[in-house]
Swiss-Prot record:
This protein's encoding gene: Defa15
Pfam families per the UniProt record, alphabetical: Defensin_1, Defensin_propep
Entry keyword Disulfide bond: yes
Family named by the database record: Belongs to the alpha-defensin family.
Residue positions assigned to the propeptide: 20-58
Broad class of where this protein is predominantly found: secreted
Position of the signal peptide: 1-19
Entry comment describing in which tissues the protein is expressed: Paneth cells of the small bowel.
A biological process from GO: defense response to bacterium
Protein name as catalogued: Alpha-defensin 15
A GO CC term attached to the entry: extracellular space
Record's function text: Probably contributes to the antimicrobial barrier function of the small bowel mucosa.
The organism of origin for this protein: Mus musculus
Length: 93
């Protein structure tokens, strides 16, 4: 009888250990898909620090974001961004 209880406890423990990584994976995917995490502001600088004043004025108004799923309206793809091993689109307006 004691052996049966011990074996049952071991089987239940094994099932619980296998179930925990699945729950953690679900929680990780939920946190990865948070809105707002898609868009990350980026500071962009181009060219020579002694560039023309016309170029400086046009770049001052340039706002860029690293986006996972493509650019929004009024934005255009201006390259790629890298955060760790992931690549994002650099979208500027």
């Amino acid at each position: 009888m004691k052996t049966l209880v011990l074996l049952s406890a071991l089987v239940l423990l094994a099932f619980q250990v296998q179930a925990d990584p699945i729950q953690n994976t679900d929680e990780e995917t939920k946190t990865e898909e948070q809105p707002g995490e898609d868009d990350q502001a980026v500071s962009v600088s181009f060219g020579d620090p002694e560039g023309s004043s016309l170029q400086e004025e046009s770049l001052r108004d340039l706002v860029c974001y690293c986006r996972k799923r493509g650019c929004k309206r009024r934005e255009h793809i201006n390259g790629t961004c890298r955060k760790g091993h992931l690549l994002y689109m650099l979208c500027c307006r």
